[in-house]
Amino acid sequence: MKRTLSFITLFALLLTACVGEDGPPGQDGELAPSFEVGNVNFLPSNNYSVREDYGFEVFPTEVTLAYILWDDNSGQANDIWRLLPQTVIFDDGNDLVYNYEFTQTHVDFFLEGSNLGLLGGEWTQNQVFRVVVVPATQVNGVDTSNINTVIALGDIQNFEVR
């Protein structure tokens, strides 16, 4: 009995001490690649649309989130980032939508509205956007409208300014 117990103990020790081969190496890189695009101008000549290439690989299982820097008219230096699309309804009944679409190679920012030609420069000139690419499985149940939540989720240290 003592010999059997010793054999089982030795066998268990050897079995748990074994090490298998290492698995394949994972991909290096950021958890959530991100960048900022400044001085975006929406003009009739560019059909109120601007394209920005990612400059990095985006996989079919990832989604792009885009945010616009919003002026809160408070006179304070508050950065307010709103998730696109964003809609503005003017007093005269006209409307404006800041929108975007994305592929695996680029993101397009564009304006939609009932009469874009009437918009002042404050709505079409020098707009600033932030883009974050995240795995689709990570955004389920996450408040993506809050850029700070997305920054924490993706462990984003800073946004590359383009």
What are these regions (language model features)?
Residues G20-F35:
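Collagen/collagen-like triple-helix recognition
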Residues A32-L43, N140-S145:
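Disulfide-bonded cysteine-rich modules in secreted/extracellular proteins
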Residues E30-A32, S45-R51, V128:
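Intrinsic-disorder/low-complexity, polar/charged segments enriched in Ser/Thr/Lys/Arg/Asp/Glu/Gln
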Residues V37-G120:
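Extracellular attachment/recognition segments
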Residues T9-A12:
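Hydrophobic helical h-region of N-terminal Sec-dependent signal peptides
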Residues M1-T4:
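Positively charged n-region of N-terminal signal peptides that target proteins for export
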Residues L14-A17:
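C-terminal motif of bacterial Sec signal peptides marking the signal peptidase cleavage site
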Residues T124-R162:
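C-terminal partner/receptor-binding element of secreted or periplasmic proteins
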